[in-house]
């Protein structure tokens, strides 16, 4: 039976993130207490409410945040779900896209807006541009008139990234800084966003203008970041880290509501989306 203030939610869709796989394999920054259910986010439908619940009703769709989403049903305090606007009967495509709202699109929005005040016509550079976060950065930047230099590690990705709204696509390598300068006609670059670490981070930092900001949110290369102190001293490069879990812990509720209020309508309207590769049932975990 439900405790006072709890709701029962049927899980409609929940994505598989690289961080989930890292956590399962014991390689993530924080180890969960066992037994633990993986999963970071998703979308569900309220199927039962308890006394004391006023803002959620049976049949309402909600975003799942806070972990443990790889299951058929979740029982949790009503306050731990984010209510969605009335969507009628959304398509399975919209349900899938909404299930990915709370991690990657939110990360992209916050990194795009929290560190540097970019204006229409400004440039940014980011690595792992073909990742899910990278795709959302491209789409959100395009909607704001911000131009993107999109760094990838292999050929054959330019067409997809340009179709999302990317302006320049470059392959990472030793001459990347010169490539960026050439492709953008030496445009000032105030923001770099990196998920790779190692030499890629350094090259992005070297491409920034004086006072530019580097934001690190991943280390896909497994390599530490090296920066010549001269870049910090003479170019006044700032280095910031971004971890979404910390934002969820510390951001005021009004800030969270404002962020979701920007993202959800874009996803529902189809203006913001990610590619879905494969679909699995919970019992199909071995195939996944």
Predicted segments with their positions:
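Short, glycine/polar-rich helix-capping loops at beta-to-alpha or helix-loop-helix junctions
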Residues: 69-72, 152-160, 224-229
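C-terminal hydrophobic helical "lid"/dimerization subdomain
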Residues: 252-288
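Mid-domain Rossmann-like dinucleotide-binding core that forms the NAD(H)/NADP(H) cofactor-binding site
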Residues: 102-174
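Glycine-rich beta-strand-centered segment in the early N-terminal region that forms part
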Residues: 1-15, 27-68
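NAD(P)H dinucleotide-binding glycine-rich loop of Rossmann-like/cofactor-binding domains
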Residues: 22, 61-128
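Cytochrome P450 core scaffold surrounding the K-helix E-X-X-R motif
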Residues: 19-25
């Amino acid at each position: 039976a439900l405790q006072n203030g709890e709701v029962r939610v049927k899980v409609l869709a929940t994505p598989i993130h690289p961080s989930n796989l890292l956590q399962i394999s014991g390689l993530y920054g924080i180890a969960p207490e066992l037994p633990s259910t993986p999963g970071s986010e998703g979308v569900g439908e309220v199927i039962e409410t308890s006394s004391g619940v006023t803002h959620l009703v049976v049949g309402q769709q909600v975003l799942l945040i806070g972990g443990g989403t790889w299951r058929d049903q979740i029982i949790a305090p009503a306050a731990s779900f984010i209510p969605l606007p009335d969507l009628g009967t959304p398509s399975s495509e919209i349900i899938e896209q909404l299930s990915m709202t709370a991690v990657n699109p939110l990360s992209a929005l916050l990194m795009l807006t929290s560190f540097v005040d970019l204006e229409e016509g400004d440039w940014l550079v980011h690595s792992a541009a073909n990742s899910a976060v990278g795709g959302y950065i491209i789409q959100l930047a395009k909607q704001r008139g911000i131009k993107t230099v999109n760094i990838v590690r292999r050929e054959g990705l330019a067409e997809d990234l340009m179709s999302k709204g990317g302006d320049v696509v470059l392959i990472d390598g030793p001459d990347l800084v010169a490539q960026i300068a050439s492709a953008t006609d030496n445009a000032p670059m105030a923001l770099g966003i990196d998920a790779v670490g190692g030499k890629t981070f350094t090259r992005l930092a070297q491409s920034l203008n004086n006072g530019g900001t580097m934001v690190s949110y991943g280390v896909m290369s497994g390599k530490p970041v090296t920066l010549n102190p001269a870049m910090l001293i003479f170019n006044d490069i700032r280095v910031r880290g971004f971890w979404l879990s910390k934002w969820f812990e510390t951001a005021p509720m009004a800030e969270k509501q404002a962020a979701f209020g920007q993202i959800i309508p874009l996803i529902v309207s189809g203006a913001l989306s990610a590619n879905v590769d494969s679909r699995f049932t919970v019992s199909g975990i071995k195939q996944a």
